[in-house]
Amino acid sequence: MAGRGCGCSPGHLNEDNARFLLLAGLILLYLLGGAAVFSALELAQELQAKQRWEERLANFSRGHNLSREELRGFLRHYEEATRAGIRMDSVRPRWDFTGAFYFVGTVVSTIGFGMTTPATTGGKIFLIFYGLIGCASTILFFNLFLERLITVIACVMRSCHQQQLRRRGAVTQDNMKAPEKGEADSLTGWKPSVYYVMLILCLASVAISCGASALYTTMEGWSYFDSVYFCFVAFSTIGFGDLVSSQNAQYESQGLYRFFNFFLILMGVCCIYSLFNVISILIKQTVNWILRKLDSGCFPPCQRGLLRSRRNVVMPGNIRNRCNISIETDGVMESDTDGRRLSGEMISMKDTNKVSLAILQKQLSEMANGGPHQNSASSRDDEFSGGVGAFAVMNNRLAETSGDR
């Protein structure tokens, strides 16, 4: 190694560790920047609201001949009632069956508006176990939705590309029927760009948000801007709880409204989740680009190449020079991973830092079902490039994650 030859290299830094540290630093800077912006925008409003409240409290105390301590004690009781779901206006019961169903929906989706919380010890204990299974199941559902959505989008875009090539005369009926002719065929190596997929998800999320906002403006009496704000907070599962839909005691066409409210929130969460994961691929690509620049431009010649290359779910080492991100259209996650299964033995401890959770889960499932399916074409390099969660779902659907490139 050149670094050791000149005596100035501190040693190799694993690329995954470098990526993790760089991303952690960027997120910290992002948090600091966000805190500065929100403090500049909201602090003055908070101080003004606090001053107005103190003035109203003093005026009310003088007008009704009440001590400030007595009045504050009464207001604390009101705060406790508010936390228990009691409101001055008429609202729907929080813990009837429909209210409880709305609550468990916010639990398993991780939205957690906070307008309803369990008050009993039994309810809090049950929530811990219920949320453990429910949240994990919902995340699995979101990943499966993401997998199928991307497959559908890619197939539709591939079909459109076929029609475009057919109009140009680049694809004939003969080579459409003979995909085995190899990479020379105009369709074989084509994949839709991830930027188009992100645009489609963006448009779908905006369309759902606009439609839902129109509904909430009509039914809840919110301004359209507040409705759009609620949609983003709910669909992204941030769930502040300052605005919550379907909380009034009565609505016009109440059953229909509650159904559409549930359906729109479900579809919005699925689309925003998918959009976030596609954006995260681009963020990771940007982090990889920064790492390459740091490795090639910021180190002296004797220390260049300190980052130990390692294949990963977004940018494997052997395709590091590719910059066009695109999505595969062939196959799904199950079929993609059939050729990358380990033999029946358990994984040695020295390799546990390389094995993705997705592959480990598949191995355990195979062993529980009597052993894995053998495939002579499997290779050890591909076993560790599956990724985790949504990254595993999109493995081999992006050019940067293709195991054969």
From Swiss-Prot:
What's one GO MF term for it? protein heterodimerization activity
Chain ranges passing through the membrane: 20-40, 125-145, 194-214, 263-283
Q: Where does K(+) 4 bind?
A: 110, 237
Q: Which residues are glycosylated?
A: 59, 65
Protein residues bound to K(+) 3: 112, 239-240
An individual GO BP term: regulation of NLRP3 inflammasome complex assembly
Q: Which domain of life is it from?
A: Eukaryota
Q: Where is this region: Selectivity filter 1?
A: 110-115
Can you list the GO cellular component terms from the UniProt entry? monoatomic ion channel complex; plasma membrane
Report intramembrane spans.
95-115, 224-244
Where K(+) 1 binds, per the record, is at 110-111, 237-238
Region (Selectivity filter 2), start-end ranges: 237-242
Topology relative to the lipid bilayer, per the entry, is: Multi-pass membrane protein
This protein's UniProt keywords:
Cell membrane, Glycoprotein, Ion channel, Ion transport, Membrane, Metal-binding, Potassium, Potassium channel, Potassium transport, Transmembrane, Transmembrane helix, Transport, Voltage-gated channel
Where, subcellularly, is it found? Cell membrane
- What note about domains is in the entry? Each subunit contributes two pore-forming domains 1 and 2 which assemble to form a single pore with M2 and M4 transmembrane helices lining the central cavity and M1 and M3 facing the lipid bilayer. The transmembrane helices are bridged by the selectivity filters 1 and 2 that coordinate the permeant ions. Up to four ions can simultaneously occupy the selectivity filter and at least two elementary charges must translocate across the filter to convert it into the open conformation.
Belongs to which family? Answer: Belongs to the two pore domain potassium channel (TC 1.A.1.8) family.
Role summary: K(+) channel that conducts outward rectifying tonic currents potentiated by purinergic signals. Homo- and heterodimerizes to form functional channels with distinct regulatory and gating properties. Contributes most of K(+) currents at the plasma membrane of resting microglia. Maintains a depolarized membrane potential required for proper ramified microglia morphology and phagocytosis, selectively mediating microglial pruning of presynaptic compartments at hippocampal excitatory synapses.
Question: What's this protein's name?
Answer: Potassium channel subfamily K member 13
